[in-house]
Amino acid sequence: MKKVLLLVSLVTALSSCGGGGGGGGSSQTGSTTPVPNNPNQPGNSNAQNPTQPGNNQPGNSSAQNPSQPGNNQPGNSNAQNPSQPGSNNPSQNQITGKGVSVAVLDSDFISPDVHTNQLYHKESYLGEILDREFKDRFIQETKSSDPNRNNLSKNNHGIIVATILGGNSGTGATGAKIHGVSVSQGSGFYLDVNKYQELQNKGVRIYSHSFGSQKSFRENPNYREEFRIYLRTLTESILTTENDRRVDVLTNFYKNAVNEGSLFIWAAGNRRFDGTNMNGVSVQAGLPYYIPSLYKGWIAVMGVRPDGREYSPYFARADWTSLQEGVNSAKWWTVAASGDCEIDGCTEYGSSFATPKVSAAAAKIKEKFPWMTGHEIQQTILTTATDLGDPGVDNKFGWGLLNERKALKGPAEFSNELLVGESAARNGAKGQFNANIGDNITSKFENDITGLGGLRKSGNGTLILAGKNTYQGSTDIESGTLEIQKENGSPITIKSGGTLITTPTTIIGLKNSHYDNFSPVNVKNEGGTLENRGSGAVITGNYTATAGSVTKAEIGSKLIVNGSVNLNGGNTTLQTLSNGRYITAKSLSSTIIEAKNGINGNFDKMKTPELIKGSVEKTDNQINVKLSRKNILEYAKETKADEMQQNTAQNIESAFQKLDEEIENGKAGNLSSFEKKAATLQALDLTNRAAILDSLSGQIYASAQALTFQHSQTVNKDLSNRLVMLGTLDNVGDNFGLWVSSFGANGKLEQNGYGKGDTKVFGGQVGIDKQFGDNLILGTALSYSKADVKFNRYGGKSDASNFGVSLYGRLGNKDIPWYLQGRFGVGFVDSDVERDIILSSNDYSRAKINHNDKVYSGYVETGYDIKNSNGDFVVTPFAGITHDTVARGSFSEDKSQFGLKADKKNYSQTSALAGVRVGKAVQWNGGSKTTFQGYVTHQRAFNDEDLSFKAEYSGLPGSSFKVKGIGLSKSKTKAGVGALTEVNSSFGWYVNYDGEISSGKGKGNNNVVTTGLRFNF
């Protein structure tokens, strides 16, 4: 609340002091505008600065200040009515000028003791205002490099102007970066070219000036003389030759800056020193009258009431002194805007406060259309203004009242007077609006565009014309894309780097409003691309395609040409595009071009989407295509796809055959969603083919089962190592033994032609066992682990939680050479699977499902210990049989039409193994014993389990096919080392490493590290 009161106090103080003749209120009309007050003079709060010429002229007192509420002017109560044309409506338009730099050249932004500061005795007040209104968006520019400029005005006019333009309390460009440039010197102003150039080098391209001479641009033909007071310091007296030189330096900067895309926005002015009306904009605002090349980067802003009516007495008009049509009239670069301050508590008005509204609009346009230079921004602001006064561009209001909302929809006219200048336009020159749109940028012009000028589309970006356009100049698409959505009355030429897109509502023709018909307009394709989307587009004239041109047509679309189609020269291409329509294996014939006056020539070649084959046929006035889909498996083989991709292609082909059958039998009504996605899939291209086929493989549901088998064998090996350990213990416990272990494993699942999976397993077991008699030990164990696998090639990932129960036993002890040991276990697996399903570069989804599995495991091993005479070294040949059964639960990927749905499936593998183990016991002085062990074993399965399963796509019931993945390896070689230390009769610890290498179909490896403790009781 304190800061709000401070701001109100600021604007109240400013209002009582006068805002500036070129801008805020008539209290400054007796001087160069805006004229700051001298706060050091007692009682000067309501008087003009007496040092200014003409200040003693009658009528130049506060009595002329029209800033009081109401001001006896009807309609002024609507000064802040957001419904007025051009007002900013944040709920409808969130464009704020973000990222755009605007320079505000005005009175004083840097003096620490500005007027309000003195009134409130708060040295930090200026900083508080700037911080609250702009935060880090305000840059206080340094003073001029001229050492003689050290007498700043200490006036708040510039802060108010900047706040209207971009402050948080205003409705302007609240996201723009504001460069506050203090150009005041005492009660005047100093234009420093070096400061201009510094701003230009910082990237500033929009310059806002709320000051200027109080003579209209036509009053003194020697405009250089009017610049004298702006190009010298207070103490200087310069000769005419020096003044002319300085003017040349300044105007040369303006010329160069305009050519670099800058836009200079000037207050038109209020009234003369003597209080009389200005019938033309100020000399500065009217500079293009003297230097015509500046026309494309200049705007003069006239201050009017919010509803467009003039104040009484009126402020500077556009060019009222030249009622006849004169060359370089300022009306061509003049626009009107509300001159009300429009900040709470501020009742000042004038062209000073109209100017920042136009500057704010320019910043917002620059944000929305970042490719626009000052010339395009100027045209957009001027041509979208709401007409005032006489119809069209007039000498009073210029183009009319600023309409920011409309301006943010793009230009409304391609005017030759703005494109090439008034003089050139009078001599018949025509210009083109240059839409030079950069890469990855799409802009839309929503206004109906009129005018005699044309359009040049350059740059690789896209421009969409969404209005009903009647501009008559030529349209040249040199590069990038132009999309026409409605009517367009301009002849179009598509150059080699350009693309024209037409839609079902496109009409290339000039609308005759009196007769409600269209005059013929031609389209010429000179090596570029015409792309017709949907049926209904009309070219009212002729369509000509020359050598190297491409004509694209969506499947099922038709382009109507009221004239003739001329396919001239060689190497013309017809290319069909997917439009969401599925093509069956049965041939489909459709007309893509129909010409009322016939077709001359034919296309030399035809291109279709990757999965579509077609041919072209020409009749007298039609071009028809016949299309059918390719066999997906044959296509995959032709492109040398690997095994996984060919399997995917076979599955898609099976589904498409089912879909074809349903369509031909008229039973596809419930399959429309799947049919649409199938059409999307048919549009794949070389850039995304591999990704699509990989993602649709579903291999993870097959391949991930290999991890379940691998995990079961990891648990099995941990228990096997414990059983071997029991055969070496001197003491297994009088009552029972308790052990706990933890293990970690990482490995790979891989097979030629499939995605590779990286596996990780972390878990542990806890067990208890008891010796029965001298030779038998029985026990039970619980295990819990987390296992995950991530596949490349869009295979997805699986995270599984495993809980298991095992029973184990060993017959034989360290004193008996022969032993028999085994284990039986049941595991419960909770698996979460995620994978991407890609149908096109823009159509992809992520499937997330859960399935619950069970694992049944059994292992039996027998061996014989061969010991040395000391009994501390042993060699043990052994053999065994292992069996695992995985019962995978059912799952359904319902969120995608091409998601997989499968019933539960059982997988089993039984293997035999043989190996040899060696051990060496070492007795330590403290009584402890460590047994070092190592082993190698080879395992071979009796069956070849490939882990494939039957599935169907969730969007196409009955489309059964086989999903394949990495199979189980038939042969594995394992090796390991470990150490068991019996610290005493009650406690021991152990560590093991086990490595596994698979060979054959399912190649891979696994590395397991196990540690554990044992307690005897």
Residue ranges and their predicted role:
Residues 667-866, 967, 994-1015:
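Outer membrane beta-barrel translocator domains of Type V secretion systems
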Residues 88-191, 201-203, 216-218, 294-297, ...:
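Subtilisin-like serine protease catalytic core
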Residues 491, 500-589, 912:
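Extracellular beta-strand/loop-rich repeat segments of large surface/secreted proteins
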Residues 806-807, 898-1017:
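Outer membrane beta-barrel transmembrane domains
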Residues 106, 286-367, 371:
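Extracellular S/T/G-rich loop segment that most often corresponds to the catalytic His/Ser-adjacent loop
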Residues 337, 344, 351, 357, ...:
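Extracellular repeat-rich scaffold modules on cell surfaces
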Residues 153-156, 168, 181-293, 344-357:
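Substrate-binding/access-modulating region of protease and related hydrolase catalytic domains
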Residues 26-32, 371, 383-386, 391-446, ...:
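Outer-membrane translocation/initiation segment of Type V secreted surface proteins
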